[in-house]
Amino acid sequence: MRKVRRVLTGAGRALSPRQMRDENGLLVGWGLGTAVFPAVMFQGQARALLRRDRTGLVELGAQDMGQGAWTALAQIAADSLGLELEKLEFQSGSSDLPDAGIAGGSSHTATAGMAIHSAGAEVIAKLAELAMGDERSPLFGAGNAGVLARGGRLYRRDDESRGESYADILARAGFAEIEGRGSAGGDPFAQKPYAMYAHGAVFAEVKVDPELGQIRPTRLVGAFAAGTIINPRLVRSQYYGGMI
């Protein structure tokens, strides 16, 4: 509603047509359109690897048709492994890699992203198990308190002053790397007990020359609920492209 107020300012609009004009005599109209689209998740897989040299690798057969999917998926991959983006090697776009589902139906980020997240979570769980079971680790015995992964290190959730690097954990355990695999989605067409949709609204102000019939949109405002936004710049560009 805050978006509505920004557009529909003033003393209010007349309900009958052709009642509003601007200072140049052009007819002014206001309109509202709603948007709804199913939030679908298909089946997909991904593979993640954490190396002793403090780098990570994520592999999946996801496609990018120019919508910026690889950028968003690489961000999810780095976050799932608790690494900076520049420390991550992201491999995608090959049928030799794990099948990450189709790039369509506004489902790709959710499908491939969930597979990546699951693969990264498995890597971190294996790493945490090594540390929490090692008496030489400051994470020893963390147990139910658990750990969190950030910046190439694991920390105790109940005391973030206690932690150590991935490299130290792997070196002490004698591992060069740890691998995890993840999957996403079931049958997208199976009957579900609930529905998931992205939704939104677009508000428009349009001016019409009553003599020439020329139509010119002068203001557009969109408000959308599309779940967690991974890359705001990418999403903003897609919104602009769809509206304009």
Identify the residue ranges that each predicted region occupies.
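Cofactor-binding beta-sheet edge motifs in enzyme active sites
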Residues: M1-R6, G10-I244
